[in-house]
Amino acid sequence: MKKCLSVLLQSTFLLFTVNVPTSCSETKRNSAKSYVEQAVEQMGGASRLEAIRTARVEYWGHRYLLEESERPDGPWIVAYEKATELRDYQRGALHRDEEQWGLGLEEGVKSSMTVADGVAQMTTGDQRRPMSMEQVVNVQEELEFSPQRLMLAALSAADLHALPDTRIHGEPYDVIAFTHDAVSVRVYLNVYTGLPGAVEWTRAYPYSTFWRVWGDVQNRLEYTTYQLLPGGIRLPLQYDLARNGQPFTSEIITKIELNPQLPQDAFVISPDVKTAFEQRKSRMSEGPPLGKPLPLVQGDDSLVQFVGAWNCAIVKQPDGLVILEAPISPAHTRALLAQAHKRFPNIPVKAAITTSDAWPHFGGIREIVANGIPIYAVDLNQPILTRFINAPFTQAPDTLAKSLKPAKFYWVSAKTVIGNGSNRLELYPMRNASGERMMMVYFPEHKLLYTSDLVQPGQNGPFFMMEYVREAFDAAKRENLTVERFFGMHIPMSPWIDVEKSLAVVESSQTKSGEN
């Protein structure tokens, strides 16, 4: 504003002499243009940047599992990766060979991903399978928000304009804004160097398992560790992405080659994968479908579980229905509510229970709120669920965004009973290391326990992460629960003795190891 005011004052003075009017909007565009031109020049010049067609990049990186760590505000579980990428900026295509390490992985896991022509393919060994539109969008952003592509787009943007300057890390930055790839972006240019320091944009990610739940997601990508490369081009080697104010990913490039000759088959995707991808894209546009209905108690149709990628259940009580879990998406929960009304006509849904702070586990809770249904949740999850209910959904409005309603939560801090009769429910906060923000749901008349997300099927054994299983077992023992069968978010009905046997095997193995 100071710059515009200065120009206006100068223009006012000039009116008395040569009558040269200058508008603030023109000044903003001119100054923005000059900022971009300086940045392009510092990066090597427009002609050199435009000549970058392909790249081969090697990097190390990590990702914070913001969506499913022990605490939503950190510290977060970390996943590490080492990757080599072939990029075709003109085509918008990318091939990545990577090895990943993380929780539950004793060794690195190798895989390849190819994204081209709006299709994403995963290759593991000789197996190829379709991925989702989430990977297509991620690659699109990786390529289009690279600093050289960003600055070239700014040069030709019709709506390029300057915003008030600011400071980042104590240093002054000029700020420009424009529309890039149909997204409004804001770029911060370091006053001292002229180089891009960060870019911000906001968008919805309806195809993302984790990010769809937050509606309009705020992104901030910082560029650091610039290096002058052969050919006179200056690019950053480190990229740090934050989403909704939390650090998300970090990558450090260890080797980069510009304009290499790429193999002709670098971006080949099999016809079968293309067909399967399009089918999955159509089928999964609003998240996975509701699972297969199965009785929780054989011969009793008042208790039904829907078994799929994200399990949930309907419990009939004398005074109404209780929904157990509203995971993954509004559409998934709408389907669950439709089943409740179909199976139990004229019986109201009196409550819903959400048992975890993992994002996909509460992804349909906004639909519950939109239907005016009270919700039982762990007391420790009040901050994240409140933030979720108040999240902006302007780009892809859900039911709650279209018709706002107040949320009614019952925050569970100790044993809480819902209903009476044979299907009464008892809620118990887990209060353990891995599941401190999870909750058990016990069906005392049926000796049935819902273990939230702590007990999951394993790939190389009966269960994933035996520590989680131990904590679920200990929590049930602490509350003096008599359990014969159990089920969870990702595991169908199973005998509790399987848990006991698996823990006994682990304890026996540990005892022998200690003796040796």
Model-based region annotation:
Residues 331-376, 478-483:
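Active-site metal-binding motif and surrounding structural segment of the metallo-beta-lactamase
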Residues 30-34, 114-185, 191-195, 203-217, ...:
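Flexible, processing/modification-adjacent segments and terminal tails
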Residues 240, 473-516:
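Divalent-metal (often Zn2+) His-rich catalytic cores of metallo-beta-lactamase-fold enzymes
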Residues 295-340, 438-457:
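Conserved beta-strand hairpin/beta-sheet module of binuclear metal-dependent hydrolase folds
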Residues 37-127, 159-164, 330:
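N-terminal mature ectodomain segment of secretory-pathway/periplasmic proteins
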Residues 250-318, 416:
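Zn-dependent metallo-beta-lactamase
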Residues 169-271, 442-444, 451-452, 457-479:
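Gly/Pro-enriched, hydrophobic low-complexity segments
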